[in-house]
A protein has these predicted regions:
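Proline-rich low-complexity regions
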Residues: 77-80, 117, 141
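A cross-family phosphate/adenosyl-ligand binding-site feature
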Residues: 2-109, 147-182, 193-222
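Active-site/ligand-binding-proximal alpha/beta "capping" segment
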Residues: 100-136, 143, 194-203
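Hydrophobic "lid"/C-terminal helical patch
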Residues: 188
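Basic, gly/Ser/Thr/Pro-rich low-complexity segments located predominantly at protein N termini
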Residues: 25-26, 56-57, 123-126, 141
C-alpha cells in the first residue's frame, strides 16, 4: 500500500470512520451505542468504516445495521482475525499490511472520524490524523465522543499546549468534542461547509508529495 493520503476535494459526508479501544465499557452500553450510531447515521444515509479493535462492538454495529440501509465495513490490521470472531454477522473485512497502512486506508476512504474512548493505540490514531490535518494532508473533521467526560482531561492538556505556544489555536480547534453522535454530525456538516468554501483557494499536498518550497517531502513510513 502506498504511503499517501488523497488530496482534498469538495465533498459531503458519505462514510464516517469510527475509532476506539478494544476494552468493553459494558455490554448494554456498547449495544446501545452501536444502535445509536446506526440510527443517527442512517438518517443521513452515511455508511460506517469501523477502524477500532473491539470486534465485539463491530458485531453490535453489524447487527444494528442489518435492518437499516447503513453499510458497515471493518478495516482490520491483524490478519489472524476471522469472521467467526464477530459472530454470525457479515460485513466486508479488510486487512492491511500494518497499523500505519490501515490508518492511511481509513483516511482515504472516509469523510469524517468519530473517536470513542481508548488507550495508547487510540491516542496514537487521534494524534496521527490530527497532525496530518494540521499539515493540510487532509481536511476531514475529527470528533471525540466524550462519553463520561473521558476526553475532558485530554482537552485540558491540549489547551495547556496552546498556552505554552506548542500548539496553535487553529490546530487545537481541529479536534471537535461533544457528547452525542447527533451533535457531532451537526459539527461535521458545519466543518465541511467551511472547507468547501476554502477548497478553491487552498489545495493541500498529498503525504509524500514534493512541495514548492525547498524542503524534503515528509516520510510517514514506519
Amino acid at each position: 500500500m502506498e504511503f499517501s493520503v488523497s488530496s482534498y476535494r469538495s465533498h459531503s459526508i458519505k462514510t464516517v470512520c469510527i475509532l476506539g479501544g478494544s476494552k468493553l465499557i459494558g455490554h448494554i452500553q456498547h449495544v446501545d451505542m452501536a444502535y445509536q450510531f446506526v440510527k443517527e447515521l442512517e438518517k443521513y444515509k452515511i455508511d460506517i468504516l469501523y477502524g477500532g479493535s473491539n470486534y465485539i462492538f463491530l458485531g453490535y454495529l453489524l447487527d444494528a445495521a442489518q435492518n437499516e440501509r447503513t453499510n458497515v465495513t471493518s478495516a482490520l490490521n491483524y490478519p489472524t482475525v476471522r469472521t467467526s470472531s464477530i459472530g454470525g454477522s457479515t460485513g466486508l473485512m479488510l486487512q492491511a499490511q500494518s497499523v500505519h497502512d490501515n490508518l492511511i486506508y481509513m483516511v482515504n476512504n472516509s469523510d469524517a472520524f468519530i473517536v470513542l474512548p481508548g488507550g495508547y493505540g487510540t491516542l496514537n490514531e487521534i494524534f496521527n490524523i490530527t497532525s496530518w490535518a494540521e499539515r493540510d494532508f487532509h481536511t476531514k473533521p475529527i470528533g471525540l465522543l466524550n462519553i463520561n467526560n473521558f476526553f475532558s482531561d485530554l482537552l485540558t492538556f491540549l489547551d495547556q499546549g496552546v498556552d505554552h505556544k506548542f500548539i496553535s489555536q487553529p490546530s487545537r480547534d481541529i479536534l471537535i468534542c461533544v457528547d452525542t453522535v447527533a451533535d457531532l454530525l451537526i459539527k461535521f456538516q458545519a466543518h465541511i461547509s467551511v472547507k468547501n468554501l476554502e477548497v478553491k483557494a487552498h489545495q493541500p499536498q498529498a503525504i509524500g508529495a514534493k512541495r514548492k518550497r525547498s524542503l524534503d517531502p515528509l516520510d510517514l513510513s514506519l
